[in-house]
Amino acid sequence: MRTNRTIGLSDVQFSELYERVARSVSWDKKKGRPRRLSLRQALKVTLTYFKNNITQDVLAELHGVSQPVISDAIAVMEKAIVQALGEFDRSLEDVTEAAGNRVVVVDGSLHPCWSWADQPSLWSGKHQRTGHSHQYICDLNGVLLFISDPVLGSTHDAKAFKELNAEGVFTSQNMIADKGYIGCGVLTPVKNYRNKGLTTNDEELNTFVNKHRYVIERSIANFKTWRIMHTDYRRKTSTYATMFSAVKLLHFFRMSFL
C-alpha cells in the first residue's frame, strides 16, 4: 500500500479517515463567515503539518490563506481526529492482553519542543534540551504496542515507568529495558559499579539484553517519521497533549492496515 509522503497515509487510509472525521465534526458554519478551507483541505493541512512539521505561515502561503486560518483548522482537526479514532487507543491493560506470554521491550524517548521560560521542568538533563517524555512498549518483532501520555522532559525513565503503575504487571520474565529502569523489577543489564568488573554470567545477560533492545529503538524511530514528534514542537505547551493524542491514534490507525 503506497503511502503519500506529504500526509503520511495511503489514499485508502485517507479516505477512511476522512469519512470518520466527517462523522465526528460539523465543519461548515451555519452562521458568520464561511470557512476558507473545505473539510478535506483542512484534514490534509493537518496531516501535512504532523508529517513534516512545516510552519503554519508556510502552509498558509501554500494554500492561499492566512496563518490564523491554518491554526484554526489544525486545532479543530486535532480534536476531530482524536474523537474519530478513539477506538484505536491502547491502555496498559490492552498491551498485556495483546502481548500474552510474549516478551516485550520498554524505553523512553523525548519529543523536543521550544524552550519556554515559564516551563523549566521541560528541560531534560539527559538529552540537554526541552521536551515531553513518553514511554514506548513493543514486542520482540518491533511491533509497537503502547505509547504513554506525556510527562515533563525532566522526568527520569524509571519514575515515568512507575507512574504507569506497570510494576508487577511487567517483570524480569516478560519485559526487557535498559539501565535506566534498574529497580523497576524488569530485566535490565547489570551495572558495572565502580568498575569492579562483571562476572561471565553478567556479561552474557548484558549481551542478551542489548541484543534484543534494538527493536524498541526501531519502533520509536518509525513513530517519529511523523516529524512533529521528532523536531521541535513550536506551539504552546498547552496544545501538546491533544496534538500527541491525534498523532498516536493516526499511527495505530495506519498500523491496522498492515
Where are these predicted regions, by residue range?
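Short, amphipathic alpha-helical "recognition" segments used to contact nucleic acids or chromatin
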Residues: S38-N52
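Ser/Thr-centered flexible coil motifs
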Residues: S10, S38, T199-N201
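Short, well-ordered secondary-structure "scaffold" segments embedded in the functional core
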Residues: Y49, V58-L258
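Charged, often Cys/His-bearing segments associated with DNA-binding zinc-finger transcription factors
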Residues: M1-K31
